[in-house]
Each structure stands twice: as C-alpha cells, then as structure tokens.
Swiss-Prot record:
Sequence ranges assigned to domain THUMP in this UniProt record: 43-154
Intrachain disulfide bonds: none
Family the UniProt entry places it in: Belongs to the methyltransferase superfamily. RlmKL family.
NCBIfam families found in the cross-reference section: PRK11783.1
Keyword Lyase: no
Reactions catalysed according to its record: guanosine(2445) in 23S rRNA + S-adenosyl-L-methionine = N(2)-methylguanosine(2445) in 23S rRNA + S-adenosyl-L-homocysteine + H(+); guanosine(2069) in 23S rRNA + S-adenosyl-L-methionine = N(2)-methylguanosine(2069) in 23S rRNA + S-adenosyl-L-homocysteine + H(+)
GO cellular component entries: cytoplasm
UniProt protein name: Ribosomal RNA large subunit methyltransferase K/L
Predominant location: cytoplasm
Domain of life: Bacteria
InterPro entries: 23SrRNA_methyltr_KL, DNA_methylase_N6_adenine_CS, RlmKL-like_Mtase, RlmKL-like_Mtase_CS, RlmL_1st, SAM-dep_methyl-trfase, SAM-dependent_MTases_sf, THUMP_dom
Catalytic EC class: transferase
UniProt organism field: Proteus mirabilis (strain HI4320)
UniProt-recorded Gene Ontology molecular function terms: 23S rRNA (guanine(2445)-N(2))-methyltransferase activity; RNA binding; rRNA (guanine-N7-)-methyltransferase activity
C-alpha cells in the first residue's frame, strides 16, 4: 500500500473523499485543498485515470524540517534518486512556500535541484537535465513554516486537462470543477441535460463522459509516472483496457441526451470540436440561441436538468444586461420546463436572485480566486409566466411617478426628466429618463451598509425598473454617484462616443449617457434655462462654469444679442459647440472660451446684461490656483460679477450646496440685492427634492 495525496479545489474536498473511497482508496483523510489516502498500485492507477475531481495525485517521498538551506539540501538528498528515475530523463521542481530561511521559492527550487544533481553525480558520475517545460519527472516541494514535504507528481500536467479541450471561450471552467458542479446538481445520468449558455461545452462534455462511463483521463497522453522507476506498465495497461471497455459499453447503452445553446457561433464551433475529441459529439446537440429565449427541445413529459455557469460581469455597465439575462432566463425556465431541475453556478449570488426562485440547496466553491455559489432549484410542475416582483415598494412608486410625469413631460415638450429621486430611503437611487433611455444613478451607500445588501438592492432596483418601464437592457445605463475630486468630473468613464439629441422646450441638446459621470444636461436647471432664454432677448449674455453650454443655447434661441460661454474644460466646450450647431446658432456673436472661470472673472472688463453662474460647491482642481468654497467665497465672487454687470442687468446665481445661506448684509455693502427664486425653478419632477439646488436673482442696489 502506498500513501498518496490528491489535491482539489477549495470546497470540493468532501466530494473527492467520497469519489476516492468509491475507487477503492483506504484511510482517506480530508485536509484543506485535498485528501490523504492509501492505495495499492491498481487503485493508484485507477485514481489517476478515473478521478473527475482531483487536480493532481502526489506520491510523498520525504518530510523534513528546514531550519537552514543545508537542511533543505540534505532533506532532498536523503532520497536515493537513482531509484526514482534514470539520469537520461529530465526533471523539474515546483517549489511553493517560504520561511525565515528560504525566503524565495526560486532559491528553494535551486537548492533542491542541486541536491538531486549532486546525488546522481556522486553515485553514477552523471547528472540529469532540468526541463522547465514538459519534464519527464515533476517533483513538488511544499514548505510551511519549518516543515517541508517532498512529493513525486504522478499526474504530470493537472488532471483537469483531460485532453479534449484545446480551445476555450471566455472565462472557462476547469474540467474538475465542472464535474463537481454536475455531481452537485442533482442530475440523473439517464435524463436530458441542457446548458443554455454552454460556451466551449465543458459542463455538457463532462456530463456526457459520466453518462457513458468514460474515464475522464482516458484521452490523456502525458503522465508524470511514465518515467518513474516504480511504474508498472503492465498494470497500467490492464487498468486502461478495462476503462476503454467500460466506455464502449457505456456509450452503447446510454439513453441520455445533451443540449447546448450559446449566442456566439465561434464558441459553439469550439464546443463541437471539444466534443469530437472527447468522442461524445453524437450525444450533444449544440445550437446557436439566446438563453433569454430558451425553449424546451425535449419531448413533452420528459424531465431533466438545466445547468449553467452564467456570465457575472466585472464592469458596472454590464450589470443591466446581466440582470436582464438572468430575469429572462428565470421566466423562460418557469414557462417551458415544469418539473425540471435547475442548477446555476455563479460568482454573483445577487444576479442569481434575479431568477426569482427559492433554492432548495446551495454549495460553495472556488473558481480560481473567485468565491462562487451553486444553487439548485426545483421548478414547479405548473408552467408560470408570472414573475414575483422584486423591490415591490420601489416598483409601485416608479410606476406611479411614470404615469404622472410622462403626460406632464409631453405637454411641456421635454424628453428628459427625473422619474425617481431616492423617494424611499432603502432604495437610494435616482432614475432619469432621456428619451427612450433611462439612467439609474446609485448614490454611494454609507460604509455602515453591508456591501452585499447594497448590491442586492441595486440589482432589485435595476430589475424592477426594466420591468416597470418595459426596457431592453441596452436602454438602461447604470452610474454610481459619489463626490467628484479634482479632474474627475472631466475624465472619461468609457469610450463609446454614444451621443444622441434630446428636446427641451424646443431646444436640442446632445447628451451622452455612458462616457462621463454626468450626461451633458443638468435636468434640475431646466426651468432656469428657460427663464434665461426669456430674459436674454436683445441682451449680452454671459455663462460661467458653463458645462456644455445649454443655458447659452437657450439664451441664443431667446434672441440674445451675444453669448459668451466660459468653462475650463475643452471637452465640454467642444460639446457646447455641437449644441450651438444643433440649434442653428453660429457666428462671432456666440463665443466659446476655455479658461479658469474665477481667474477670467477677475481679469475681464467686459459688460453684460444677463449673467448666469452655477459654480461647483467646492473645487480644488489643479488647474485652479486656490480652492473654492461657494459658501465661503460667494461674496468675493459677487464683487467680480457686479463689476461686469451693466446697469439694469441681472445675475442668476445657482448652486447645489445644501443649507446655503446668502450673506445679504455683505451683498448690500457691495451694492447688490438678492431675491431667492428656488421654488420657481423647481419643476414637477424635482418637487420631491426641494434641496436639489438653490437659485437667486441679483441686481444692482436700487434696481430690483
């Protein structure tokens, strides 16, 4: 009997222990990442050939303490290496772990290599060669604190490499993890199995190999034991011949059928090639198709299992599409697969919640560095087309707001308006409509809120919004709103360049919902812009901190004699120029100026009749010499504005600072008066948030 160790993925140890015991292993003991066991040579070979779950199977050679690099050298040299492999064969050492003495794994591997080479040199006067790629003998040393374990890797390459998969789609599952998912799914080998997002076909191929009693490593060519002097070739041939016979018989007798769907034709071609190499292609039907439109390819009355590893998404912008995919998959399986089993493996339990089913069992496992969950569901015997709504309170409020505001917006000739603005504290988002598209802005949750809970609520909101507003996934854009720092407000978030025109009181504006944190149009200033248009006929108009120049466009359309648009961002000024062009405004009377607004204001001597200024609440941009705080600095700001304001002129001053207090006394001292008009500038869609901005009209004293 030999002492052996089988490694596996985290979370699969118990499954591996059961599998090894079924293969005849004895004295199985679970440890983190694997199972120690004892086996005779036949069981050892069967474990290598038949284990669907093991990553590698090792033959321990020695254990020793390492208090110095000499201890490592002597511990490795204690083995008579001429009895392990011949000098004509290459070897490699995989060293992992460090301690206070061996602080570098490469150094550890080098010392171990020296020990083996010196051992051969002393005994037979020759030395074997090291081969980092495809060595004949692969040795592993694991060092933990002072304890080192030295093993011969009987597998060679990892056992997940079955030999059938040369090409893979994006983010493939390792074959041994796929096998574990199938084992845990509740699938019975004589029933149909469907993967609606099959990718390169790994789950279906592994299942087909189980159904046909095919040893998972039957197609492997390279093994780590081939040049080991303890290898029994006759016994190995006996074990493999038995396996081939079992596969022939199993393939002849299986009744199981497998169905794979994917939207990517290229990946399906890979899947078909993989299935051919595994010799199970005749059992699997691969079809190009969308999981969201999944229907049942199996005869009525036959029940099987749907299994999949759906995409989970790393980028924020992909989440609406993934939420839609999971929601639509949930509807499809409930409608077309009564009485079937469903098993989904994912790195995102929040996305799985969009299926809107209660799992009867859950398992945890690692997929590389990712913490994943597998959820098993039993679908109702009664087909259902009704979805239980997530975030019901939010959905009801959104539905009510949409009904009220859509009619109002049409009457007002506006295409962009706010549908929801954190009306309910537990759903802390804003929902804005831009024509046929909708933007959800998530306000960054407090650190006290559990991250998974916040993410789950956001997913519920997205799912409910898509359902209530009947949106396709490409019509919904997700943003996270947080405090802007430095140049962040000017930096691109994406490179889509997806601009489209929207209408506001007859003015046309280009908006971009994806590339920047903001969209190009501040919706809460809509009425203020309209007022500026009405105030500017025949007047010289100045727009400071102008953003994309929408207020200037309204002034121009309102008949302004001239418009001057000042902003520090070249990007936004180019955007403003497009807005002018979209409205037929051109000529030297419409100036666009790139400048630090505060610096420009302090240096300019021009005169204007109407001035609009909407400064940031706070700014410490590197392109500004000093910091700016709107509460602290608004009087200094007004001093400069007064100098540029003609007699009889008006300043419209707006800002977003909550609790802003105008210093009327200081204003009077510089010869200005101010009247708050905030309530007049709040339109119906912002009536629920009266602190979205504050707005003032200022005039020279005695002219109000």
């Amino acid at each position: 009997m030999r002492s052996l160790f089988a490694s596996t993925g985290r979370g699969l140890e118990e499954l591996l222990k059961t599998e090894l015991e079924h293969l005849g292993a004895q004295s199985c003991q679970i440890t983190q990442g694997g199972v120690y066991f004892r086996a005779d040579d036949k069981t050892m070979y069967q474990s290598l050939l038949w284990s669907r779950l093991a990553s590698r199977i090792m033959l321990p050679l020695n254990e020793f303490n390492v208090y110095s690099d000499l201890d490592l050298y002597l511990g490795v040299q204690a083995i008579d290496w001429s009895e392990v492999f011949t000098v004509n064969h290459t070897f490699a050492i995989h060293f992992n772990g460090t301690n206070d003495v061996i602080r570098n794994s490469q150094y550890g591997a080098l010392k171990a290599k020296d020990a083996i080479v010196d051992s051969f040199q002393r005994k037979i006067g020759q030395r074997p060669d090291v081969a980092k790629q495809s060595p004949d003998i692969r040795l592993t040393i694991h060092l933990h604190k002072e304890k080192a374990s030295l093993s011969l890797d009987l597998s060679g390459d990892g056992l997940h490499q079955r030999g059938y998969r040369d090409l893979t789609g994006q983010a493939p599952l390792k074959e041994n993890l796929a096998a574990a998912i199938i084992m845990r799914s509740g699938w019975k080998t004589d029933t149909p199995l469907i993967d609606p997002m099959c990718g390169s076909g790994t789950l279906l191929i592994e299942a087909a190999m189980m159904a046909t009693d095919c040893a998972p490593a039957l197609n492997r060519v390279h093994w780590g034991f081939r040049h080991w002097l303890g290898h029994n070739e006759a016994l190995w041939k006996e074990v493999t011949h038995e396996a081939f016979a079992r596969f022939r018989e199993g393939k002849k007798n299986t009744q199981a059928r497998f169905y794979g769907f994917d939207v990517d034709k290229r990946v399906l071609d890979m899947a078909r090639a993989n299935a051919r190499r595994a010799d199970v292609a005749d059992l699997i039907t691969f079809t190009q198709g969308d999981a969201a439109k999944l229907t049942n390819p199996v005869s009525t009355g036959v029940k099987g299992t749907i299994i999949s590893n759906p995409p989970y998404g790393e980028r924020l912008e992909s989440e609406p599409a993934l939420i839609a995919l999971h929601s639509q998959l949930g509807r499809a399986v409930k409608a077309h697969f009564p009485g079937w089993r469903l098993s989904l493996f994912s790195a995102s339990p929040e996305l799985l919640s969009c299926i809107q089913l209660r799992a009867e069992r859950e398992f945890k496992a690692k997929n590389g560095p990712l913490d994943c969950v597998q959820k098993n569901y039993l679908l109702s015997e009664t087909p259902s087309t009704i979805n239980t709504r997530l975030a019901e309170d939010f959905a009801n409020r959104l539905r009510k707001n949409e009904k009220k505001l859509a009619k109002w917006a049409k009457q007002q000739q506006i295409e962009c308006y706010r549908l929801y603005d954190a009306d309910l504290p537990e759903y802390n988002v804003a929902v804005d409509r831009y024509g046929e598209k909708v933007v959800i802005q998530e306000y960054a949750p407090p650190k006290t809120i559990n991250e998974h809970k916040a993410r789950q609520r956001l997913f519920d909101v997205i799912s409910a919004t898509m359902e209530v507003l009947a949106l396709r996934s490409d019509q919904l854009i997700l943003k996270t709103r947080q405090r802007q720092k430095g140049k962040q407000q000017y930096e691109k978030m994406a490179e889509k360049g997806d601009f489209f025109l929207v209408d506001e009181f007859g003015a046309k504006f280009w908006v971009n919902l994806t590339d920047y944190l903001d969209t190009g149009l501040f919706l809460d200033h809509r009425i203020a812009r309209k007022m500026l248009g009405e105030m500017s006929k025949g007047k010289d108009f100045l727009n400071l901190f102008a953003y994309t120049g929408s207020a200037s466009v309204h002034a121009g359309l309102g008949g302004a004699k001239s418009t001057t648009t000042v902003d520090m961002s070249r990007t936004y000024l180019e955007w403003a120029e497009k807005n002018f062009q979209a409205n037929g405004l051109s000529g030297r009377q419409h100036r666009l100026m790139q400048a630090d607004c505060l610096q420009w204001l302090s240096q300019s001597n021009e005169q204007f009749d109407v001035i609009f200024i909407d400064p940031p609440t706070f700014s410490n941009s590197k392109r500004m010499e000093n910091t700016f705080d709107v509460q602290r600095d608004h009087i200094e700001l007004m001093k400069h504005l007064k100098r540029l304001l003609r007699k009889g002129g008006t300043i419209m001053f707006s800002n977003n600072k909550r609790g802003f207090k105008m210093d009327h006394e200081a204003l009077a001292n510089i010869g200005l008066t101010a009247k708050e008009i905030t309530q007049k500038t709040l339109s119906q869609d912002f009536a629920r948030n009266r602190q979205i901005h504050n707005c003032w009209l200022l005039n020279h004293a005695g002219e109000e």
